[in-house]
Amino acid sequence: MKQYQKDFVDFMLGSGALKFGEFTLKSGRVSPYFFNTGAFNTGQHLSQLGKFYATAIENSILDFDVLFGLAYKGIPLVTATTIALNDGFSKNVPYSFNRKEVKIHGEGGDIVGHQLEGNILIIDDVITVGTAIIEAMSIIKANGATAKGVIVAVDRQEKGKGEQSTIQEVEQNFGLSVLSIINLSHLVDYLKQGNDHALIERIEVYRDCYGV
């Protein structure tokens, strides 16, 4: 676990984006932890979040030409991350996002920002069932570019409908590389540095049941 990943867990806890307790997920599973990106709701939060995404991208070996955020949630993520890549790593990365409604006047089209061309890295908060990724890939393909990978904040490392995680299914079915700032294993390692053994046990039990 790298230092920026430890710092990201601290950041999530401090902002209230990561909570522990009993949370019923869309899947019906009762999880001992919950990640809510809606808690990143200030300029400072967004600036910090962009830096973490940028650092994770820089720590990967993925080569891409344009960073793409899917409306609406992906718009602040792609904006903050490209600023952080420029300011922190001197990487002037083109970015774009889509419109929900195609504009027929002015510059027109369904894309705002840089033209989608070459290899595209999609940015999202989490991958739940993969619907957003399918939509993003459709937009990218329609604009003549190629989806290369996806970066998310948290990989729950949790089974989807089968024995694989949704992220594993995305990687296998679409040939995409999926990056994350942290995953569940990182979170468990972080918590083991503390003294809340009961919480660790609850997460381990949940992981034994639903983890991959």
From Swiss-Prot:
Pathway: Pyrimidine metabolism; UMP biosynthesis via de novo pathway; UMP from orotate: step 1/2. It comes from Ruthia magnifica subsp. Calyptogena magnifica. Belongs to the purine/pyrimidine phosphoribosyltransferase family. PyrE subfamily. Its EC number is 2.4.2.10. This is Orotate phosphoribosyltransferase. It catalyses: orotidine 5'-phosphate + diphosphate = orotate + 5-phospho-alpha-D-ribose 1-diphosphate. Keywords: Glycosyltransferase, Magnesium, Pyrimidine biosynthesis, Transferase. Homodimer. Catalyzes the transfer of a ribosyl phosphate group from 5-phosphoribose 1-diphosphate to orotate, leading to the formation of orotidine monophosphate (OMP). Its cofactor is Mg(2+). 5-phospho-alpha-D-ribose 1-diphosphate binds at residues 26, 72-73, 99-100, 103, 105, 124-132. The gene is pyrE. Orotate binds at residues 34-35, 128, 156. One of its GO terms (cellular component) is cytoplasm. GO terms for biological process: 'de novo' pyrimidine nucleobase biosynthetic process; 'de novo' UMP biosynthetic process; pyrimidine ribonucleoside biosynthetic process. One of its GO terms (molecular function) is orotate phosphoribosyltransferase activity.
